[in-house]
Amino acid sequence: MSMLKDPSQKYRPFSAINLPDRTWPSKTITEVPIWCSSDLRDGNQSLIEPMDAAKKMRFFKTLVQVGLKQIEVAFPSASDTDFNFVRELIEGNHIPDDVTIQVLTQAREDLITRTFESLRGAKKAIVHVYNATAPSFRRIVFNQDKQGVVDIATNAAKLIKKLAAEQPETQWSFQYSPEIFSSTELEFSVEVCNAVIDVWQPTPDNKIILNLPATVECATPNVYADQIEWFGRHVDKRDSVIISLHTHNDRGTGVAATELGLMAGADRVEGCLFGNGERTGNVDLVTLALNMYTQGLHPQLDFSDIDAVRKVVEECNQLPVHPRHPYVGDLVHTAFSGSHQDAIRKGFAQQKEDAIWEVPYLPIDPADIGRDYEAVIRVNSQSGKGGITFLLEQEYGISLPRRMQIEFSQVVQGETDRLGLEMTAQQIYSLLENEYLKATSPYVLASHRLQEENGTSAVDLEVSFDGEKQHWRGIGKGPLEALVAALPVKAEIMDYHEHAIGAGANAKAAAYIEIRLEGQRPLHGIGIDENITTASFRALFSALNRAVTQAEAKAA
C-alpha cells in the first residue's frame, strides 16, 4: 500500500475555530508558567522498559535539583510498583516542603480510592483525574453519550472531594483533564469542566487545575491557541481556575503549540525533559524553558549543567538524546560549514562580557548551560570527520563514540592544518595512539586486583606516580565505580562505551571513557586489552592523565 493520490478521501482537515477577535497573536510570553514534570508518569509509561524504583528515585531527585515544584510521580492504582514508589517518597521523607507531588487516576471509584490510599500522610498532593471526551472516543471506545461522559467526570469529582475531606492532614489540590481536549467540541469541553467546577467549588485562594491536553496533536499550533483562548473566555470561575497545557508532538509542533497556548492565557505546562512520552513524545520542558531564557525571561528552572541532566535522563529512560536536539544535542553548538565558523569566530571576537549576546548562529551562550567553546570554535571539516571515523572502523576496528569523534576530530584537524596534507589511516591511528593510548603520565597503572561479592566490587591498584609507587584501594557497586572511588582526585564518569575488536581467540576489548575532573571540561580516554575490565581501567587512566596534563599546561 502506498500514499493515496487523493488523501482527502481518507483524511479530513481539522475545523478552524471561529474566533475573529482572538487576542493571542499580539501577545508575548512575559510570565513564567507553573511547570509540572510528567517524566515519571507519562514519560515512564512510554518506555520500552519502564524505570524501576531506583531509577525513578534518581530521576525524581534530578527534577527537584532542576527546580520543578510540581512533579507527577505515578499512576498508583495501575501497579504495585507505582503505588510503592509513592509510599516510599512519602514515608522516606524524600519530598521537599516546596515540592508538590501529583498522581494520576482514571475516573473509577476503585482506582480513585486506591490513589488516596497511596497518598496517605503526604504534606501536599495534586489528585489528577481524567476521562475521554472526544466524539471518536465516546462513540468507538466507550459507547457513551455526552451526559454519560459528564456523569463519569462529576461522580469522580464528588468522590475525590469526599476522600480528600477524610484526610485533612494533606493540603489537597484537584486537577481534571478532559482527555483528547484538542479533538473535543469546545462547547462540550466547557460543559464538562463547568460541571466539575460546580462539584469542587474552587475559589481564588483555593484554585483547581483544568488540564487541556492535545493528547494527539491533530492541527496547527494556532488552532490549539484559539481553543485555549476560547475556553478561557467561556469557563466558569476563571479567577479560580488554573488552565494547564499538556501537548504532544505528533505533528512536530508541541513546543510551538505550548508557547502559543501560553500567549492565549494558559497558566501552567505539563511535559517531559527532552520530550520523552507516548508516540512522538510530550512537549519538551527543556526547550520551552531555554526558549524563554534566550528571550530574557528566566524560566526558574536551572539547566546550568545540561549535560549532567541529559546523562540522568538517558540512563533512566534508556533512550539517547538526538545529537540535533535543541540546546542539548552533541552537535547543536557545532558548525561544520566554513562560512558559519568564520561568522562565529568573528562574533566571539567582538562579544564583550556582560553585553547582549549577538554571536551569529548561536542563539544561546553555551557557557550558560555548562558547555565549553571547544566544539564551537574549532576548524572542522565534515568530510574529514566522517573520513576519520570510517578509516578507524575499517582499518583498525575502532568505533569511537559520537562525542569522542568530535573531540578527536579536533586533534586530527590541528595536525592537517599543521601539515597541510591529507592524512592516511596509519597517520590517524598514530595520532590516536599518541593522544590516548600512550597517555601514561603522570599516573601509570602497574597492576590491579579485583574482588566482587554480593554486588560490591573492591579494587586494589599498584600505581606509579611520577616514578613513586603508590597503593590505591576503592569500593563501589561495580569495577569502574570502585576505581573512581580509589582515585586521588574527584572525578565523574560522564559516558562509557565498549566493543570487541576482532573475533575468536585473538579478539581484544576496546573501552572508551569520558570523565570530568572537578572544575574541568570532560575528556575521553581509550583502553585496549584482552580483558574488558583491564581495558576499561586503562581507558580511565588514559582520560585521567590527559585531564591532569591539560590542567597543568593551562596553569603554566
Swiss-Prot record:
| GO BP terms in the entry | L-leucine biosynthetic process
Cite the GO molecular-function annotations of the record. Answer: 2-isopropylmalate synthase activity; acetyl-CoA C-acetyltransferase activity; magnesium ion binding
Keyword Ribosomal protein set for record: no
Sequence segments annotated as region (Regulatory domain):
439-556
What's the catalysed reaction?
3-methyl-2-oxobutanoate + acetyl-CoA + H2O = (2S)-2-isopropylmalate + CoA + H(+)
Q: Which HAMAP family match?
A: LeuA_type2
Q: What is this protein called?
A: 2-isopropylmalate synthase
Q: Which organism is it from?
A: Pseudomonas aeruginosa (strain ATCC 15692 / DSM 22644 / CIP 104116 / JCM 14847 / LMG 12228 / 1C / PRS 101 / PAO1)
